[in-house]
Amino acid sequence: MTTSSYFLLVTLGLLLYVCRSSFGTEHTCESDASPHPQGVCGSPLAEAVEAACELEEYLQGGTGKKRGRASPLRKRRAFLSMLKARAKRNEASPLQRSGRGIVCECCKNHCNIEELTEYCPPVTEGSG
């Protein structure tokens, strides 16, 4: 094996190791796991998602993009009410994403703003 082939093999191995170790930090939790000390649960979690979605929408710069809502304020309140009601009943199934849910990611673990915005409704083109 030549030196360049060996170097390439070692480099690919290191790259694979780095990728695997960084992607292995996804939040997972058991059903009986207790909330994280810095986790956000219940109604505050629903409010945090709403705030994160509004911030993301604001940062997109008012380019005529909307979150598919006919009446933004009414739909936002309905969405928040639904989240609060489900949080009180401890049902997060509509918020599941790839086998993990928002309760697992942000209540039983600590999540950041990027993770919160992953639960926002999709942005669609529309008129103001």
Swiss-Prot record:
Keywords: Amidation, Carbohydrate metabolism, Cleavage on pair of basic residues, Disulfide bond, Gamma-carboxyglutamic acid, Glucose metabolism, Hormone, Secreted, Signal, Toxin. Residues 1-24 form the signal peptide. GO terms for molecular function: hormone activity; toxin activity. It is found in: Secreted. InterPro entries: Insulin-like (IPR016179), Insulin-like_sf (IPR036438), Insulin-rel_pep (IPR016724), Insulin_CS (IPR022353), Insulin_family (IPR022352). Heterodimer of A and B chains; disulfide-linked. This is Con-Ins F1.
